[in-house]
A protein has these predicted regions:
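Acidic (Asp/Glu)-rich catalytic clusters
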Residues: 8-12, 38-46, 66-78, 110-114
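Short, well-ordered coil/turn segments that N-cap beta-strands
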Residues: 14-18, 45-51, 75-79, 113-118, ...
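Distinct, well-ordered alpha-helical segments
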Residues: 32-40, 61-72, 93-96, 135
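Alpha-helix-loop-beta-strand connector modules within alpha/beta enzyme cores
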Residues: 45-46, 71, 103-121, 172-194
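Conserved strand-turn element in the central/C-terminal portion of the radical SAM core barrel
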Residues: 84, 90, 115-133, 154-159, ...
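Auxiliary Fe-S-binding modules of radical SAM enzymes
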Residues: 143, 149, 157-230
Length: 230
């Protein structure tokens, strides 16, 4: 079976699988030969036309990119690399214990740009301590780096985590829903029009979250945002 992968069907009725996503965890952290085997397993499915690999910016190595290039050329599947940046603010990255800074992200992007792959970046616009200025700066940096795709996330706080304790005792705060809308709009206004925005909100099972989307369903949030943008 494919390692942490899922399939997304094409248009209704044709039954073709198009997309294999290695989404969970840091996929380029596994051993190289194991990584090669899992990706080849996906690539040999003739219905798949794109493989998406999620990983950390500080876990991008040329040897893994070379493996993906070989698979790209051999099996004629597109390759998309998904990197979690979350914010361009180093102090916030340190506060949430990301374990990398902006420099590692830029290095990863420059490495990947040498290959015929697309790059998707994940960004959270309501991290503790981040401001509107950080939102705009993040959008500008992604534009300068010619990122292909962006997925926006609204922060959720998992139960029984350090962040949940800090939120509960008031050490940190999360911006309001209205402020989040303003940040999304500002991000869109400052991001390059050549960059595709694939997601505006994220969601998790309610039973796992101490805080999630201001107790509002993601689709209601999206409708509210679109109404605000009209």
């Amino acid at each position: 079976s494919l390692y942490m992968s899922e399939f997304i069907k094409n248009t209704p009725g044709n039954g073709k699988f198009l997309y294999s996503a290695f989404q969970n965890y840091t996929n380029t952290f596994m051993k190289l030969e194991q990584f090669r085997a899992y990706v080849i397993e996906a690539a040999t499915n003739t219905d798949i036309v794109e493989i998406s690999i999620s990983t950390r910016p500080d876990c991008i190595k040329d040897s893994y990119l070379d493996v993906l290039l070989d698979i790209y050329n051999t099996y004629h599947v597109d390759i998309n690399i998904e990197l979690g940046l979350q914010t361009a603010n180093y102090h916030t990255l340190d506060f949430i214990n990301r374990g990398h800074g902006l420099a590692e992200f830029i290095d990863a992007v420059l490495r990947i740009k040498k290959y015929p792959f697309t790059i998707c970046t994940h960004v959270i616009l309501n991290l503790p301590n981040d401001t509107m200025r950080d939102t705009i700066e993040t959008a500008k940096i992604l534009s300068a780096l010619n990122i292909d795709i962006v997925k926006l996330h609204s922060l959720y706080i998992a139960k029984n985590t350090k962040l949940s304790y800090q939120y509960r005792n008031g050490t940190i705060s999360i911006c309001s829903k209205e402020e989040y809308f303003e940040r999304v709009i500002a991000f869109i206004e400052h991001i390059s029009p050549d960059i595709v925005i694939e997601r505006l909100f994220s969601r998790v099972p309610e039973e796992d979250a101490y805080f999630s989307n201001w107790n509002t369903s993601w689709w209601k949030l999206q409708d509210e945002l679109l109404d605000k943008m009209m």
